A protein has these predicted regions:
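Intracellular juxtamembrane helix-capping segments at the cytosolic ends
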Residues: 111-124, 306-320
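Extracytoplasmic gate region of multi-pass secondary transporters
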Residues: 24, 203-247
């Protein structure tokens, strides 16, 4: 077993995990194209992948106990390629075609977000596992940066052309087929008593709650940045693409440094990350100019690139190794639920404030800061009770 080849496969598939975010730069263009369509329906082009991501992120954990992870990964990648190509060729026919494509993208997002972390937990241990989770986050954001920039430039010609970036699924499928080994799930009679009795604990469920709240509040940025740029007259889809690219660039750098930050901050890494995200949202609400959007994007990128590997690492190390995939699936699915309901809640807040778009960023500021406080208090209680402590 060549671990270097496994790393190549994991990191290549990870580089596509945020490809559905390319829609964030063209939401305003899609809204102008489909005249009279409810804005909430337009936002679902971006949020439906999170809904399907929820279903398949959770389902992939139990499925991996019965099917090879390699097969699940390839299935997800093929769904992503299919969704992107259908959107490219037929997305202009109806908003519902785009929504259907978003469902397929969600399958890819949910399946492989869980599998990428589960594969790391399977083949790598202790500090090597944590460092690789950070590197995985760097590739998620690095890939996102390139994809967002490319799709933003293509969207400057036509929003439909932004879906050309989904062709990148083809080489990744080849890399995974060549480098990822076929694992063979254990049968019931192969399981040891400790594995059969293994259960999820309060640490996993609390981390899932934090990830849910994180998804609710941080995703305010992705679903509203293009609308905010258009409303303020700061530019077009290309401008939104550059802002999203800066978010991914900050996330990529953060992912590379994640291993070191985790060793220094330990359990404070999640609260600190949430506070940084809160400050980014606050800069958009208080200052509200184009530089503030870039600052906010970089703060959100730091938050995103830190929370995902940190939350996954906590969940995987809080339970018996035999159910680490299930723990990761629960945490990943919780984040997807938060992302899906985010525009519904933020739109309700904005409507209550008279349709003020900027108030969404204030709501996100308060929410992220409150979640940071909750994380500190909750983990202190769990530590005191000795529940789900991280394994060395």
């Amino acid at each position: 077993m060549d671990k270097r080849k496994i790393k190549v496969a994991i990191l290549s598939m990870s580089s596509l995990l945020m490809i559905s975010m390319t829609a964030s730069a063209v939401l305003a263009d899609i809204q102008r194209y489909f005249v009279g369509v409810d804005p909430s329906l337009i936002s679902m082009v971006l949020t439906i992948p999170s809904l399907m991501g929820l279903v398949f992120a959770f389902a992939s954990g139990p499925l991996s106990l019965h099917l090879p992870k390699k097969s699940l990964v390839i299935f997800g990648l093929v769904c992503g390629l299919t969704g992107g190509m259908v959107a490219l060729l037929f997305g202009s026919l109806s908003i519902y075609v785009l929504l259907g494509c978003s469902l397929l993208l969600g399958v890819a997002q949910g399946m492989n977000s869980t599998m990428s972390m589960a594969l790391i937990a399977d083949y790598f241990v202790a500090e090597e596992s944590g460092a690789l989770m950070g590197l995985q986050s760097a590739f998620v954001n690095g890939g996102s940066m390139v994809l967002l920039f490319s799709s933003g430039m293509l969207a400057g010609v036509s929003w439909q052309l932004s879906y050309l970036v989904y062709l990148v699924f083809i080489p990744v499928i080849v890399i995974v087929m060549k480098n990822l080994p076929n694992d063979h799930p254990q049968t019931a009679d192969q399981e040891r008593p400790a594995e059969k009795s293994a259960k999820l604990n309060a640490r996993v469920y609390f981390t899932a709650l934090i990830m849910f709240l994180f998804g609710v509040f941080l995703f305010v940025f992705q679903t509203n940045v293009a609308m905010y740029v258009a409303a303020k007259g700061f530019g077009d889809a290309s401008t939104s693409g550059l802002i999203n690219t800066s978010m991914s660039a900050a996330g990529m750098l953060t992912g590379v440094l994640f291993g070191r930050m985790q060793r220094v901050l330990r359990q404070l890494i999640i609260p600190v990350s949430l506070v940084v995200g809160s400050l980014g949202m606050l800069s958009i609400f208080v200052i509200g100019n184009l530089p503030a959007l870039f600052i906010g994007a970089m703060c959100c990128g730091f938050c995103l690139a830190t929370i995902n590997p940190a939350g996954t690492f906590v969940a995987a190390n809080a339970v018996h190794a035999s159910i680490s995939s299930l723990a990761i699936a629960v945490v990943t699915a919780s984040c997807s639920v938060g992302i899906f309901v985010s525009p519904l809640l933020s739109n309700a807040v904005a409507n209550a404030a008279g349709g003020n778009l900027a108030v969404k960023f204030l709501w996100a500021t308060l929410g992220l800061f409150g979640t940071a406080v909750l994380a500190v208090i909750g983990n202190a209680i769990l530590d005191k009770k000795g529940i789900g402590g991280q394994k060395s």
